[in-house]
């Protein structure tokens, strides 16, 4: 994973996703890493030929919406998060990274079948869509436990200081 996406894993905004809860006590960051690992495992176990680097990068960025979806407001009612966050994640990821068509497909289509008209077109998107559903279920029912959110300020150096403090 590190070889495929060092720019993502070390970016300030990706590190900020440790400060937002996704499901249960799982952060968005942990969830995206889980989905990435499971996506690779699915492709390996089922011998699905795919572009692994794009699979990993798309999985890491599939929930790159960069806000706490549990807090609703007039523009982001929390009960509609599932419908609109793929577009927000794609916009955010596109503004920071040069995405391939496969990576865009993964990010934009990962909520299918909820987003009925956004059918995945490549096998990488189908794999991530499947892995995302499985991870979401296991995280929601607390079969997989997270560590809760981390207070994160805006820089990589600040994040490393927080992690060092927590380890001690």
Describe the role of every protein-language-model region.
Residues 1-168:
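Metal-dependent phosphohydrolase cores
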């Amino acid at each position: 994973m590190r070889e495929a996406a060092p720019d993502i894993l070390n970016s300030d905004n990706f590190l900020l996703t440790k400060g937002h809860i996704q499901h249960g006590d799982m952060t968005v960051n942990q969830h995206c890493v889980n989905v990435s690992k499971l996506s690779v495992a699915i492709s390996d176990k089922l011998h699905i030929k795919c572009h692994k680097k794009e699979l990993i990068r798309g999985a890491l960025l599939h929930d790159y919406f960069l806000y706490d979806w549990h807090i609703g407001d007039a523009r982001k009612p929390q009960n509609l998060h599932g419908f609109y966050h793929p577009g927000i994640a794609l916009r955010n990821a596109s503004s920071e990274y040069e995405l391939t068509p496969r990576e865009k497909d993964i990010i934009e289509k990962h909520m299918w079948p909820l987003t009925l008209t956004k059918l995945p077109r490549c096998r990488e998107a189908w794999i991530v869509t499947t892995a995302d559903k499985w991870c979401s279920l296991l995280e929601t029912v607390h079969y997989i436990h997270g560590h809760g959110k981390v207070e994160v300020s805006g820089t990589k150096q600040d994040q490393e200081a927080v992690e060092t403090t927590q380890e001690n």
